[in-house]
């Protein structure tokens, strides 16, 4: 069962002061307040992830560190809080998010184990992440000029064979299953597919690969210097 199916409102830890995280505070002060009370998990140029306990288990809290982080929170919540998309097994479940402010300062999700590229490719049953995203584009009917068609892609899939990669028909089936899940997500959201070639945007939750960062969308591209 996905967390958002039965959680309507989950507060921050009871000893936290919501006023310290509102938009009247500076980004620096909000972040300092949170990090003084939670263990840092990681972060990037726009948000910092930390862990807070909920019902006896660790969960992930993402706090915006600038305007780009607020935009990423908005984009991520748009997907995670959607009645259909939020229940797709390919994404990390949402627990709660900031409803007190006009723009969400924070959001809370289940916590996933970080993984590196070799582990991610093994879990997705793919010899490369570029081949995986190629398959997703094929499913969506959005092939790029130099993409392989389905016949070529399958030939390439089984062509690669070494001590670390010996694909079977079962692998091919799982590869297609995950590609279809991602295609379903991307085709019904503004998520940028190419961003999913970055292993840092993935994790492991309940023994399966999940997308943990959904903040890079067609709406947030402007914050990354993309034109057009």
How would you describe each model-predicted region?
Residues 11-56:
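ATP-binding glycine-rich phosphate-binding loop
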Residues 88-175:
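Conserved structural core of kinase catalytic domains
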Residues 59, 90, 107, 192, ...:
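Protein kinase-like catalytic core scaffold
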Residues 1-10:
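Short acidic, low-complexity intrinsically disordered linear motifs used
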Residues 51-55, 111, 205:
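Active-site beta-strand termini and strand-to-loop segments that position acidic
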Residues 192-228:
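Catalytic activation segment of kinase domains across protein kinase-like and atypical kinase folds
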């Amino acid at each position: 069962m996905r967390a958002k199916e039965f959680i309507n409102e989950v507060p921050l830890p009871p000893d936290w002061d919501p006023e310290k995280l509102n938009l009247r505070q500076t980004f620096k002060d909000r972040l300092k307040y949170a990090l003084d009370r939670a263990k840092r998990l990681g972060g990037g140029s726009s948000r910092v992830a930390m862990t807070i306990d909920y019902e006896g288990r660790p969960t992930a809290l993402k706090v915006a560190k600038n305007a780009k982080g607020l935009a990423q929170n908005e984009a991520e919540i748009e997907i995670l809080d959607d009645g259909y998309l939020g229940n797709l097994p390919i994404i990390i479940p949402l627990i709660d998010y900031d409803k007190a402010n006009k723009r969400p300062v924070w959001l809370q999700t289940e916590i996933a184990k970080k993984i590196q590229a070799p582990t991610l490719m093994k879990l997705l049953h793919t010899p490369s992440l570029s081949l995986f995203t190629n398959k997703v584009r094929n499913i969506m009917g959005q092939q790029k000029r130099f993409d392989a068609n389905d016949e070529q892609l399958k030939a390439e899939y089984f062509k690669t064979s070494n001590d670390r990669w010996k694909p079977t028909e079962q692998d091919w089936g799982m590869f297609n299953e995950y590609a279809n899940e991602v295609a379903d997500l991307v085709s019904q959201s503004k998520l940028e597919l190419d961003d999913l070639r970055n292993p840092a945007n993935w994790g492991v939750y309940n023994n399966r690969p999940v997308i943990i960062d959904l903040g890079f969308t067609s709406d947030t591209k402007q914050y990354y210097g993309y034109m057009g």
